[in-house]
């Protein structure tokens, strides 16, 4: 991978990370088209740190409030009043606990299915299937769901279901935001609430995954045939951070005025295009380097 290709992949990451269209699927597809090979799970996870840093910058006031209220309730002057220590009556502290609960599914599944995620699940036929299925689901749910829940209405049950939706993004093509937004809309959250919860809930999971992959890359960079090198990877990460911040602003304005129908149609169209490219042999379903890594 050269630096120009890294810049392109950084742009692709920034444009697709927050939208319910699957950034990992786009990185996989563009990587094959430009490089002739899959950039790999490590590259994908590390450049996602860039887009997540953009989330932290944009939502910095919310994040500071969540952390300060959470610590204040848990370790403050609430004494033996465990309901108060768990955030009763404090929306920010409660949201902090909900983010923790919502992170549990992806942590468990991410660790237990790590080898499958990095190899078998990167088959493009799987990507095509989930792009199509979750595109249809997003379209149906968004069109029919009620819109009466805000971020302050989230329960532990809802948080866990959000987490299950997020964990589906371990399969390239599902989309982390697509999974959580679909669940949120199905549970009756407004479009704005669903997308904001999706952003905040992703922070622990994406940072955790990115840091673990970075540590692995440091240890194995000489023997990992799929890792493109630190120079291109860091360039892509910086590009994804800068452009990602702009995309967040535009996406939040979009969902305040429009439905997710356009994204659902895009997913279905992309699934058809990738399927055709697979059939005619332009794209390989499984990259040879992934097979070797397995």
From Swiss-Prot:
Keywords on record: Antibiotic resistance, Cell membrane, Cell shape, Cell wall biogenesis/degradation, Hydrolase, Membrane, Peptidoglycan synthesis, Transmembrane, Transmembrane helix
Disulfide pairings: none
Pfam families: BacA
Bilayer topology term: Multi-pass membrane protein
EC number(s) recorded for this UniProt protein: 3.6.1.27
Transmembrane segments: 39-59, 93-113, 123-143, 198-218, 232-252, 268-288
Molecular function GO terms recorded: undecaprenyl-diphosphatase activity
Cell compartments where the protein resides: Cell membrane
GO biological process: cell wall organization; peptidoglycan biosynthetic process; regulation of cell shape; response to antibiotic
Main subcellular localisation: membrane
Catalytic activity: di-trans,octa-cis-undecaprenyl diphosphate + H2O = di-trans,octa-cis-undecaprenyl phosphate + phosphate + H(+)
Taxonomy, superkingdom: Bacteria
GO cellular component: a single term: plasma membrane
HAMAP family: Undec_diphosphatase (MF_01006)
Recorded family membership: Belongs to the UppP family.
General function of this protein: Catalyzes the dephosphorylation of undecaprenyl diphosphate (UPP). Confers resistance to bacitracin.
Note: Bacitracin is thought to be involved in the inhibition of peptidoglycan synthesis by sequestering undecaprenyl diphosphate, thereby reducing the pool of lipid carrier available.
Name of the protein: Undecaprenyl-diphosphatase
């Amino acid at each position: 991978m050269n630096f120009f290709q890294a810049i392109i992949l950084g742009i692709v990451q920034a444009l697709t990370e927050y939208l319910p269209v699957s950034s990992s699927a786009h990185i996989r597809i563009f990587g094959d088209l430009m490089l002739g090979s899959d950039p790999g799970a490590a590259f994908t996870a590390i450049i996602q740190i860039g887009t997540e840093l953009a989330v932290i910058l944009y939502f910095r006031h919310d994040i500071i409030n969540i952390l300060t209220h959470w610590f204040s309730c848990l370790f403050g002057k609430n004494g033996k009043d465990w309901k108060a220590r768990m955030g009763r009556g404090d929306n920010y502290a409660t949201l902090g606990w909900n983010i923790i609960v919502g992170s549990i599914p992806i942590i468990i599944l991410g660790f237990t299915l790590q080898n499958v995620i990095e190899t078998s699940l990167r088959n493009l036929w799987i990507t095509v299937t989930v792009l199509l299925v979750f595109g249809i689901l997003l379209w149906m749910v968004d069109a029919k769901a009620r819109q009466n829940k805000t971020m302050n209405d989230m329960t532990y049950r809802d948080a866990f279901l959000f987490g299950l939706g997020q964990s589906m993004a371990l399969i390239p093509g599902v989309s982390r935001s697509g999974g959580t937004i679909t669940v949120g809309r199905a549970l009756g959250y407004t479009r704005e609430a669903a997308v904001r919860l999706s952003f905040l809930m992703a922070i622990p999971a994406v940072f955790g995954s990115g840091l673990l992959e970075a540590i692995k890359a440091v240890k194995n960079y000489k023997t990992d045939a799929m890792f493109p090198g630190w120079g291109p990877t860091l360039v892509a990460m910086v590009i994804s951070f800068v452009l990602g911040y702009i995309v967040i602003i535009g996406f939040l304005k979009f969902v305040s005025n429009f439905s997710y129908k356009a994204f659902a149609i895009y997913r279905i169209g992309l699934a058809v295009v990738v399927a055709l490219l697979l059939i005619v042999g332009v794209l390989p379903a499984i990259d040879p380097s992934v097979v070797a890594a397995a």
